[in-house]
């Protein structure tokens, strides 16, 4: 099996990578963790459309990202196709996409995916977004509300934790309303005050992971390379950084739940390191 669109991918990686680095000036840590050959699955958190750029500019290898079919059928579909993306229909259990990905891995190529399965941002999730806005609709215009969500990068996983804490009466309704639009700061404060456990805090950092990455790694012998991006996709003072973690293998006899938890722990570790470096002014 020969990779398609290799020349187009290299051209766009060079062009897009140039402007990406020029505009965002990301700090990339431990890119040497990406093997130069053999089947690999790059597994990252998902906070922005440009998340895949970090991996793409960190290796000479072509990385085939799995992307929802709407991206490939939209006005920039040509770009996603030339970038080697695999079209995924999220409305069904897309066996064609899965088989294509497995085929690539079995031939020793590189796959990229986001094991959370979706972007972890409240402003882009209609159901969560509308429910949260009910708390503020009498005080904040909707456009301003969305602007605040984007500026503070309020994550769905953070709101999920706040919902649980409210239900368990670990926080009050007033605290929820006063802090939901800056959830990460509030959750960190709760941890410092020992009102929540470290495990609860960890739950706020990522959405629950899907089994796809560890399942494909087990079936093909591919190595999983975790990568986590923290900071903001803005022009100045963004503290944008991505760090690659320890490689993960999933032996044939390993329980997939155990493998998924292993991947999650490594991704959480990387995110904590990124947040710590930002807080300490290292990035």
Task: Give, region by region, the residue ranges found by the protein language model.
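Non-catalytic C-terminal accessory region of glycerolipid acyltransferases
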Residues: 1-8, 98-283
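A generic local structural motif
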Residues: 26-31, 50-52, 72, 98-99, ...
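Structured helix-beta-strand junction loops
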Residues: 22, 37, 82-83, 107-108, ...
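Helix-to-loop junction immediately C-terminal to a conserved catalytic motif
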Residues: 14-46
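Residue-level "edge-of-site" marker
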Residues: 32, 93, 230
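Short hydrophobic helices that act as membrane-entry/anchoring signals
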Residues: 6-24, 77, 81-84
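Catalytic core of membrane glycerolipid acyltransferases/transacylases, capturing the structured
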Residues: 12, 36-93, 100, 125, ...
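Short, basic, glycine/proline-bearing loop/turn elements
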Residues: 15-16, 82-89, 195-201
């Amino acid at each position: 099996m020969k990779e398609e669109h290799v020349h187009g991918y290299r051209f766009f990686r060079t062009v897009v990578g140039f402007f990406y680095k020029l505009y965002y000036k990301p700090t990339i840590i431990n890119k040497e963790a990406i093997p130069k050959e053999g089947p690999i699955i790059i597994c990252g958190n998902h906070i922005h459309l440009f998340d895949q750029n970090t991996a793409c500019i960190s290796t000479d290898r072509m990385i085939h990202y799995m992307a929802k079919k709407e991206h490939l059928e939209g006005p920039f579909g040509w770009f996603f196709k030339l970038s080697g993306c695999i079209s995924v229909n999220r409305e069904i259990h897309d066996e064609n996409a899965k088989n294509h990905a497995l085929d690539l891995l079995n031939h020793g190529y590189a796959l990229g995916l986001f094991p959370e399965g979706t972007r972890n941002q409240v402003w882009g999730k209609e159901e969560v977004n509308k429910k949260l806005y009910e708390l503020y609709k009498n005080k904040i215009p909707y456009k301003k509300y969305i602007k605040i969500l984007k500026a503070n990068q309020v994550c769905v996983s953070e709101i999920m934790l706040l919902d649980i804490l409210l239900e368990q009466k670990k926080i009050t309704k007033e605290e929820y309303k006063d802090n939901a639009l800056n959830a990460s700061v509030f959750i960190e404060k709760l941890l410092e005050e020992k009102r929540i456990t470290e495990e609860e805090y960890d739950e706020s950092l990522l959405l629950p992971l899907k089994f796809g990455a560890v399942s494909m790694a087990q079936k093909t012998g591919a190595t999983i390379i975790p990568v986590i991006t923290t900071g903001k996709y803005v022009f100045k003072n963004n503290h944008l950084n991505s760090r690659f973690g320890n490689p993960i293998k999933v032996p044939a006899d390993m329980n997939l739940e155990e493998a998924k938890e292993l991947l999650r722990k490594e991704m959480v570790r990387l995110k904590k390191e990124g947040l710590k470096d930002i807080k300490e002014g290292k990035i």
